[in-house]
Amino acid sequence: MNITIKSSRTVDGNIAAPPSKSMAHRAVLCAALAKGTSHLHHLAFSKDISATLGAAARLCARVTTGENDAVVEGLGRFLPVDAPVDCCESGSTLRFLIPLASLTGQEVTFTGRGRLMERPQSVYKTLYQQQGLRFEQGADRLTVEGALTPGEYELAGNVSSQFISGLLFALPLLGGTSTLHLIPPVESRSYIDMTRAVQHAFGVESRWLDENTLEIPGGQHYLPGDYTVEGDYSQAAFPAVLGAVTGGVAITGLSEETLQGDAAILEILRRCGARFTRTGQGVVFEKAPLHGTDIDLADCPDLGPVLMVLGLLCEGTTVIRNAERLRIKESDRIEAMETELRACGGQLESEGGTITIHGCAGALHAPEQPLSGHNDHRVVMSLAVLALATGLALPISGAEAIAKSWPDFLEAIKPLGAEVEHVG
């Protein structure tokens, strides 16, 4: 899908944060592992969440979806897996399910699309080899076989928290107690605690013995229940950056009491000089002069692309550190954003996981050729923010990538003054 996006008027208006994708993944799996019927409220059926729902239905549950909810009937047993489980492009789906597949007593093969099977799984590969289990990763599929055992596990704490969460889902169902030793530094701790909080809502417990060690009692059972998903700070970051630059934007549906690591967007914007007010379940932005700052992305890597846009629109220099994981997402997000922002006159450079961005709002211009979305939802949405914040008409190819996380994004931003033209 090729589009041209621009602002049709002064940017202002209200936008609702979509349901949290991170929390929805976790709630779907907990509900599927619980014997009985659970009702999940406030869902958005992005491609990633649809992948997790589909995988749950293949492995251990019956799933019925409504307009924005789902009924998940956990069967209390694993079904025969006679064909590959399709994870589409969802890294969360794949990494959460690999340890659970090892509880089925079967050979389980996962497939995916885009760059999914290129993304590193060495944490699991090493763990499986240590336990004498089968772990084979090819160009388009990944196969596991053999049963995990309770005991001591050691993982690097600076890898994706998805690996740690995947083990947290499976280990409580084993017969004995397990301990996860995380080698510091532990990054994305908020996502680990989000997993634990959703598990708690479904009757499964774990505890921190110290800041680097988790104890997971075995012999537990997930319990069915009703669960309502919070609004998503990861997605709200896009209108939040826009609101910080232009003012006049109100975002609804954001809980102040949240475990979402990407809620850090508000503190980052505050450090840049943004002016906003919390209003219960919302945030209202006023226009204010913005300046560059130093940003540590270790605990909130998904904010990276839109913060690169923010840096261009601030006075002075913005430095983003610990952004290495952006290179192994749906695209190499550092390279993708550098390429597209430079095409618009952006001044930025990177070395490893450090990105330096020079404020240059007055020098930005429309590109000579359409910008590429790089098959990456966060790249597309970040470029849309750039268009609306600057008033430039930006042509973007591959805009369909937004379906991965926020299918209604283009419609959602129209009340803010966005004009979206579909080309070809």
Task: Identify the function of each model-found stretch.
Residues M1-G424:
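Short, structured segments at the rim of ligand-binding sites
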